């Protein structure tokens, strides 16, 4: 392959990718699959950044009248000449995205939707001169594209019927029924839920979609995308021949996301084949239908970064492209059972959950099982198996965190949550601080055990002991730095013959504190690990740097951890 092909970072326009020399992984088989088995309304639900918009743009380029057919040359779909002759460039197409329907108030979101519909409708300005339309029909069209005070302006009734009217006018003009492609249909509902006008937005979206998708003689078929399948009773009431193609569906399972061989070929094409295992570890692991796929957004960004810098490390591209409030919501309301389940997920284990694919946004936080369901449908968790429920025909899904990147989301959100919890518990932190100054081992141990009990562990059970030790070192360091603003705290500072874990210089210029942290492989090994820590402090002369400053009243601590328990010993 010619390595001069640009990587389409952030580009989701199919025609632009094909005409402007961007790298493209062929997903045109999706067109054939849809046309062989389509419903009047077809809803694809996938997590964000999985190529939904690019695939919808591909559909538009394939079906719309006047398309440049050459952009499909050499692609899979071009081999099916009968299908191309029957469908390519044969239909009027309305492609509308709801991703920018947003606002702090309903009025602002409503206006954003009006502007989007007006702009889409204005793209069909030839309708004003069509000899196939009556004067009244042209006035209907004018009502959708009229400008007032520099913006599109429509009455409520016109907004509700706008898309259906467009289908009617385009069908009459071309003599062919209209295909509708509605991308990110659920974004307005998500934003409305976040900002407190959910009921008004549900009514608006239900009205618009109901008009254009239900009993519309001018509709050929419609394709919708979103992250969630909103309850049919909420939005899609009365729509017949409605096909939902979720991440559990084997149909079209390889068409959203990249397969193993596609990632291997992409890396090889840019001379980066040696990075395959790293890409797999970080960005693979999503199980859709019967296949495992990678997040395309991640892979394209990863390869683009490597092309610029072959030594670049993997980054959390998917995390950084949007908010991760769902994980935080789960943690905020987690009881002890849920905390244990989160710990198991982070440790690389699976949990079993009954997943509800049909929810409304205002049901998400009604119970914690609904949040688990949304974490699954939005890509934070993925399926690795099924378990039949006792005395039932239903199944629970075995869920895991798909890859390293998503694990980082959980860890980051847990760390932020824990910082806030600790910040609120000033009294307990002050007790810990005072106990450390007084060498009160029992009180230090009790306070640390209370904190450990409350927290959510982010340890991977497969991690090396040294990594586990580093985790507890970081935890203790964070607690100490928040305990007394007048302490000077150093971590892994070179001192004497080696490096001490933590050195504290209290306000008293004669005092100093040394802490060595150890990880015990069992509860029974806590005492021995404390002893090892104390021996290390003494044999490696960690107190040297304090004595050089005239700090002779030194307390030495050996603190050992195992899971959510610790042991403290000291020497003055």
What would you call each of these model-derived segments?
Residues 181, 187, 197-238:
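Sensor-1/coupling segment of RecA-like P-loop NTPase cores
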Residues 1-80:
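Walker A/P-loop-proximal flanking segment of P-loop NTPase domains
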Residues 121, 162-173, 200-220, 542-545:
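Substrate-engagement module of ASCE P-loop NTPases
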Residues 242, 294-541, 566-572:
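Extended alpha-helical interface modules used as scaffolds for assembling large macromolecular complexes
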Residues 545, 549-572:
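Domain-level recognition of nuclease-like catalytic cores that cleave nucleotide substrates
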Residues 234-237, 245-304:
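Amphipathic alpha-helical segments of the small helical/lid subdomains adjacent to P-loop NTPase cores
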Residues 9-18, 108, 112-160, 188-194:
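Conserved P-loop NTPase mechanochemical-coupling segment
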Residues 10, 61-126:
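P-loop NTPase motor core
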